[in-house]
Amino acid sequence: MALRDFCSVDGSDLFWEWNVTWNTSNPDFTKCFQNTVLVWVPCSYLWVCFPFYFLYLSHHDRGYIQMTHLNKAKTALGFLLWIVCWADLFYSFWERSMGKLLAPVFLVSPTLLGITMLLATFLIQIERRRGVQSSGIMLTFWLIALLCALAILRSKIMTALKEDARVDVFRDVTFYIYFSLVLIQLVLSCFSDRSPLFSETINDPNPCPESSASFLSRITFWWITGMMVQGYRQPLESTDLWSLNKEDTSEQVVPVLVKNWKKECAKSRKQPVKIVYSSKDPAKPKGSSKVDVNEEAEALIVKCPQKERDPSLFKVLYKTFGPYFLMSFLFKAVHDLMMFAGPEILKLLINFVNDKKAPEWQGYFYTALLFISACLQTLVLHQYFHICFVSGMRIKTAVIGAVYRKALVITNAARKSSTVGEIVNLMSVDAQRFMDLATYINMIWSAPLQVILALYLLWLNLGPSVLAGVAVMVLMVPLNAVMAMKTKTYQVAHMKSKDNRIKLMNEILNGIKVLKLYAWELAFKDKVLAIRQEELKVLKKSAYLAAVGTFTWVCTPFLVALSTFAVYVTVDENNILDAQKAFVSLALFNILRFPLNILPMVISSIVQASVSLKRLRVFLSHEDLDPDSIQRRPIKDAGATNSITVKNATFTWARNDPPTLHGITFSVPEGSLVAVVGQVGCGKSSLLSALLAEMDKVEGHVTVKGSVAYVPQQAWIQNISLRENILFGRQLQERYYKAVVEACALLPDLEILPSGDRTEIGEKGVNLSGGQKQRVSLARAVYCDSDVYLLDDPLSAVDAHVGKHIFENVIGPKGLLKNKTRLLVTHAISYLPQMDVIIVMSGGKISEMGSYQELLARDGAFAEFLRTYASAEQEQGQPEDGLAGVGGPGKEVKQMENGMLVTDTAGKQMQRQLSSSSSYSRDVSQHHTSTAELRKPGPTEETWKLVEADKAQTGQVKLSVYWDYMKAIGLFISFLSIFLFLCNHVASLVSNYWLSLWTDDPIVNGTQEHTQVRLSVYGALGISQGITVFGYSMAVSIGGIFASRRLHLDLLHNVLRSPISFFERTPSGNLVNRFSKELDTVDSMIPQVIKMFMGSLFNVIGACIIILLATPMAAVIIPPLGLIYFFVQRFYVASSRQLKRLESVSRSPVYSHFNETLLGVSVIRAFEEQERFIRQSDLKVDENQKAYYPSIVANRWLAVRLECVGNCIVLFASLFAVISRHSLSAGLVGLSVSYSLQVTTYLNWLVRMSSEMETNIVAVERLKEYSETEKEAPWQIQDMAPPKDWPQVGRVEFRDYGLRYREDLDLVLKHINVTIDGGEKVGIVGRTGAGKSSLTLGLFRIKESAEGEIIIDDINIAKIGLHDLRFKITIIPQDPVLFSGSLRMNLDPFSQYSDEEVWTSLELAHLKGFVSALPDKLNHECAEGGENLSVGQRQLVCLARALLRKTKILVLDEATAAVDLETDDLIQSTIRTQFDDCTVLTIAHRLNTIMDYTRVIVLDKGEIQEWGSPSDLLQQRGLFYSMAKDSGLV
């Protein structure tokens, strides 16, 4: 009564009247309803949203938008609307003043509407000031207002058309004005305003249009259409990609995760937290709690010493990304509730078809309702998916960023526990797992909610019978739980095998040259395949489990339906299974199918993510290096006169290991030159590492004053140009740069390089010699102009007088660094007299310290050290024209040699150190070059660009790729799978059609006949579905494993068969990417996608068949809709495919850069370049996400459009059912509409899966890409196999031999004609680039000859297999490479030799004592790259390999250049005795080592200049003589 009085004076105006609104052929709302509800609904919406929206705007300021015509128009219209509403109000007041009685509604509604319009105008201005370009809240408000006004408009028009109607002219006119203004406001709200002032997108050359897109464009994903059109017309390139939105960049995402992880670590530890800063400010207080936001963002990761509990990474991820998931939660909840609208409307539609008296408009109303409901579901669902995918992308970005930052600060001990392979997997596979989970995580609560709601509605429909279905589901729970537990076990085992395989592949790729030289490819291939076999075993078990899982998931909804229907019809004869009950229940069962199907997938995804979560937590919880172990002081600190002060310090590599350095005490005054000398493994390199804070300080105090530069023993070179390697992120200062390059003896090298200092250096410096790499490493340190220089034996890898040049011009008292503090680890005793201080190390302690003269006078360990080497020289014999007069022990007979005052005791060592194969000191002095000349132009950019970026294929994935995959599976299994799929879906269709026939059975005496028959056949069809499901699931899973095995085998075999040039130009990141990410896709993703694709395809075909059978009129509409569908799908796939390829290609640099960083992490830390490398990594990740982000939006773009096509099928199926209701049975209507309701989902899944299929099959394409590259010559040729005892003599002939590195480059060796008799010892000398190493590459056929031939014992080596050749000759390479595994495996990977033979070789290589002392002896595990052995010990292992093989021909490629004098002596003496009857070819740096050789080859510019015995060549006074003279040998 209250509302009646509120709406009319006499209470005659009812609020609601069924006969007016519903039970009529011409429905309308009552006046009261129009004046209250239809006015109040839009007002209520805006007032409810206002406080939340205002709060949101207060916290999200995007900048200020200037007043535009659009904004002025919206504001003006807002005021006009307010005026119109209040005009209505004032008109009411005027009427009352005229004595007319008015109901309160005429005062309240205009007042409320007027105030709401003012609020709307206020919000329009607030949005403008906060930078909102298009508002969803306001657009929705205007839409609701218009829809409500539309109902009123229809009513007013209908009233006006009546003859006896009373018309209120003023209110009607104001309403028409109001309606027009609201309509214009709605239209204006569809457009976006201009960008805010000072917006970051203004300066962006290619901003993402999303930020400036209108609300409508955003919810329909229209803003990406431009890229889709472009991608359809021509393949997308990386330049076409838009910049990432600021909130998605690493710069925004990573620091938040790192900060939250830091807080979580702090909570889980007892001690206060310590922050590791990447700041370069040495005065920054460590562990300070008062840090601003920016500083916190720069904190790399947290060091937390004492454990209480493990920090929870899950909590951290939740805290960081929780708000995004809350948004997705809201969208998902709305969507889930809307899902159940379909079955309820279907129930009403079936009732309508059954009720022939119902007004016609109700059928059209239900159809419209079904369509609108489906469209709203579509928009809500894809906003949800978009949020999930973007959140997943951000999680991946954050995880990669956190792992990278952690890798920069992790201790060396922790680094050893996490191999490169494992860390790369954390970035590739584990980060991806989190990304995948983000999409499904809401299903944890959503799936049970959907199940509960479906069961509730089923209870209303079928009563207690539904409990039978619940019982079936409950029975399935323990089965699913067991499978989930098993899945986790298999997942852990799979990840472990994968880590081991990637680790081994990494090592193989890093040491590929050594593998080829030793012909060890097959041994390592077997090792990889053994690990792969374990991996495939686990995959096979997972496949069986997946088949059982698929069987239960597909069968569960059917079993639930069958058991429910069976109980329903059998418990009571009067229970009739009519169309409404059956098909509404079926629609609900179909809703039930999705959560039941997806839950196991979600569980599996959660299991995988939990494994990854644990791995990631363990890695991020590893201990960090303690930067406080070294006290850093600014260079201007007047209080400290010493640059380095160490007091009673003890250091260890790992907390639990015994100390490596004990009781170290010394100080170095500013500007001093200090040498660190000692035997192999005495702790020289460790001392430098300790000063770099790379070791754990157990006790003591260490102070370093000023900035530090570090040159490691093994040079670390980046895959960038030579110039960029030297500049290392610093500005180019041309004069100083030129001075550095000249001082480091790099000018002659720049002459040789195709593009001077702009030449790109391959990964790990593959296109530079060892000496060149070391000089570039030194130049980098010199150019950075630091205060303290830690130089770890930088002169060992260079020619001796290049060493002299570098010492004089860089390190020595007159060099570029003369005013700097220098700590030089060296084996070159000729430089020792010029040192200010010499530190003698022994057994991890400082045994002596003092100046050269002081140490000699003491006649202690240092004097003994010098005497040992002087006598060693004497024993080896003197060259004819050598220096005479060696004084007695300790006798200081002085002489001048090369401008250095040295004792005679050291004189012979000096001869040895300064002897060389080239004359750099002269060469360098002749170069006076500007940096413009250093940038010598190469023939073409391609000629000098060595490393190929990962390329993206373009265009459609070729059918041949699918065919290749089918062949890899096996054609029988492929066709069997398709046949089983077909059988399964035929059974499914027939069972549903059978159900419709059942529901149409006539009712006789309150019951249906043939119920038992109907039920039995229905059950039998269900069982046949189950059997075929299990069959196809098994077939696809097992076929997938066959394909994985075959594709991996082909890839591995081909990569190992590729020539060395392939590895030089292919970054290892590309190959690691193939063996990790792409192979993981083939292992896990493709079989799953095939099952889903085939299922979706048959579902769509089946649904169309049913709709056509039920309503033949649909034949008119299905073909055009199919055409639209096909067009949209092709449109999408063209762009999606290319985006996936671009994403794949941009992923490789992320891993390559990460690999590079891990190898050079100590250098990066020493130079304090962490920030720059973090920025580079972030940039590469962002580049990768730039391709990924459009691909996820494209997915949504497609889904929205396809679902609209699906919704049209729902609309027409319902419409035709309404039109044909008099000729259709309720059963067929139910069947048709229930299938049409599913079509949307099926279409969506079909396109999603077809695009997933195409984007994932790209992995096969990329694997095949490297399976079909060029191959080197066959390893074995049966017809041309040499005799088993070949070569017997060891005679080597070069006949007019020529060699070039690539077809488009000049010859590096020309017209080589030389014969080396068996048993001869031949030295090969020449300056850098003369072709010395090229000669050995030719001998081993690492590079094939361009002309001429090499004959060994009358056999042309080009005619025999590569392994036949390489097994018969042995090399001791310049870089000693070891692989992780046992020491025995490193010596004899094929297990050809007995333990006795191995021990003999170790004894002869002077390693027996060392190996015998190891706990595991021959089974001692070598670390990755042999890092747990010193360089000298590694070189001796290489010697032991040679002794074990004992071939007739031995090649030494500068094998003793990188070792100390003692190791050099050991190697030389062993070679002289053990290889006495062998042909020995030695590429020599130190001329004295070859002075007793039979003959010497002198190479220059790729040609033999001189050839003869050393004495003959000295008498000729040619090139060799000048070298010997430079070296002080004559």
From Swiss-Prot:
Pfam families reported in the protein's UniProt record: ABC_membrane, ABC_tran, TMD0_ABC
Top enzyme class: translocase
GO cellular component, one term: basolateral plasma membrane
UniProt entry tagged with the keyword Translocase: yes
Membrane topology note: Multi-pass membrane protein
Transmembrane segments: 34-54, 75-95, 101-121, 134-154, 173-193, 317-337, 364-384, 441-461, 465-485, 548-568, 591-611, 967-987, 1025-1045, 1089-1109, 1111-1131, 1203-1223, 1226-1246
Tissues where the protein occurs: Expressed in heart, spleen, lung, kidney, skeletal muscle, mammary gland and weaker in brain and liver.
Phosphoserine PTM positions: S289, S915, S930
Positions that bind ATP 2: G1326, R1327, T1328, G1329, A1330, G1331, K1332, S1333
Taxonomic superkingdom: Eukaryota
GO biological process: cyclic nucleotide transport; glutathione transmembrane transport; leukotriene transport; lipid transport; positive regulation of inflammatory response; response to xenobiotic stimulus; xenobiotic transport
Positions of the ABC transmembrane type-1 domain: 325-608, 974-1255
Binding residue positions for ATP 1: G678, Q679, V680, G681, C682, G683, K684, S685
Compartments, record wording: Cell membrane; Basolateral cell membrane
Residues of the ABC transporter domain: 644-868, 1292-1526
Residues carrying Phosphotyrosine: Y277
UniProt name for this protein: Multidrug resistance-associated protein 1
Natural source organism: Bos taurus
Gene that produces this protein: ABCC1
